[in-house]
Amino acid sequence: MSEFSQTVPELVAWARKNDFSISLPVDRLSFLLAVATLNGERLDGEMSEGELVDAFRHVSDAFEQTSETIGVRANNAINDMVRQRLLNRFTSEQAEGNAIYRLTPLGIGITDYYIRQREFSTLRLSMQLSIVAGELKRAADAAAEGGDEFHWHRNVYAPLKYSVAEIFDSIDLTQRIMDEQQQQVKDDIAQLLNKDWRAAISSCELLLSETSGTLRELQDTLEAAGDKLQANLLRIQDATMTHDDLHFVDRLVFDLQSKLDRIISWGQQSIDLWIGYDRHVHKFIRTAIDMDKNRVFAQRLRQSVQTYFDDPWALTYANADRLLDMRDEEMALRDDEVTGELPPDLEYEEFNEIREQLAAIIEEQLAIYKTRQTPLDLGLVVREYLAQYPRARHFDVARIVIDQAVRLGVAQADFTGLPAKWQPINDYGAKVQAHVIDKY
């Protein structure tokens, strides 16, 4: 349980005065992890400069760096870590030039995060909760006994402050590491979705089930011990109610209660969020594997799965009936209200007679397309016919050609619902919009 006794300006001035800074590129961080690993294998926890150089040599080889300047670069790295308070250097007058190095609390904290805290262990968590339960019970018994201020400080406040609070912080850190692991699993699933769908399903299910199981183990362990922990905290709180001079204990107990409630609450909320994510991934991946033909939907789904926690989503699909282009074959070819008066050349001729003559000729000529099963492009055919007639007859001839053509068959492209391109059919700006007739 962190408690700051200094204000923000004081902390800023202190950090500036001491020139605190941390800069750890990947090679330097790897060197620090190597030092921590080798240091953990030693009983005395001390390392000589030669051992640090050997560790640096391993890191340098792994990064394929030159070995010619290994001594200079190792010395620079060691001095840099001493300056950043990651290593402590101890020199002796008896062994001049042969310094001893030990990891600082900062160095241990960084390496502990990357090495030890990355692995979740139900047994480790159970042991931590067992220790907390024992400390809280002893503190509660001491609070019930009562005593002077020294008694409260030594037997109640100190165990709560320096044992219970630190273990609560460790459990909170475990939860935050699990949050990072959830994000890593999401990234792994996104990478799997870039591969073959059917091969990805089993891998995704394995990742999802492992994460769900780990979260459930963590929460079950917390809930099993949570009631006892809260009960002992309440015992301590009740004991302080009759003492006006124990505000520091009461405030600490309140902070611990809030921390424990927050840990248990976030554990359950994290499980609920993951269950929702798990359910959606299973449902939509199995649906999408049959729907995805051109990999377009896969790309959108990968992005949606990746950002699910930020933007939750649901899939709704509909199967609408096809839209058919229904033509009235008996529709009158010409409407006086639309076309206006007859051209002068046709003023003294009966329109129906001309229509029948042209229709018979055009029908005979267009029948060749049906006989040969050749696609009929109305744009090209109408343009060829209009080139044979004067401009005054273009409108009527075009209507006749189109009318006869649509009697022969239909265009399969009409069923796609996509509009056809406009094609010019004469030199005066007239255009027609029609798909190629390919089904007779």
Swiss-Prot record:
GO terms for molecular function: calcium ion binding. The keyword Calcium applies. GO terms for cellular component: cytoplasm; nucleoid. Its main location: cytoplasm. One of its GO terms (biological process) is chromosome segregation. Disulfide bonds: none annotated. InterPro entries: Chromosome_partition_MukF, MukF_C, MukF_C_sf, MukF_M, MukF_M_sp, MukF_WHTH, WH-like_DNA-bd_sf, WH_DNA-bd_sf. Pfam families: KicB (PF03882), MukF_C (PF17193), MukF_M (PF17192). The keyword RNA-binding does not apply. It is found in: Cytoplasm, Nucleoid. Residues 208-236 are annotated as: Leucine-zipper. Keywords: Calcium, Cell cycle, Cell division, Chromosome partition, Cytoplasm, DNA condensation. Involved in chromosome condensation, segregation and cell cycle progression. May participate in facilitating chromosome segregation by condensation DNA from both sides of a centrally located replisome during cell division. Not required for mini-F plasmid partitioning. Probably acts via its interaction with MukB and MukE. Overexpression results in anucleate cells. It has a calcium binding activity. Interacts, and probably forms a ternary complex, with MukE and MukB via its C-terminal region. The complex formation is stimulated by calcium or magnesium. It is required for an interaction between MukE and MukB. Belongs to the MukF family. This is Chromosome partition protein MukF. The gene is mukF.
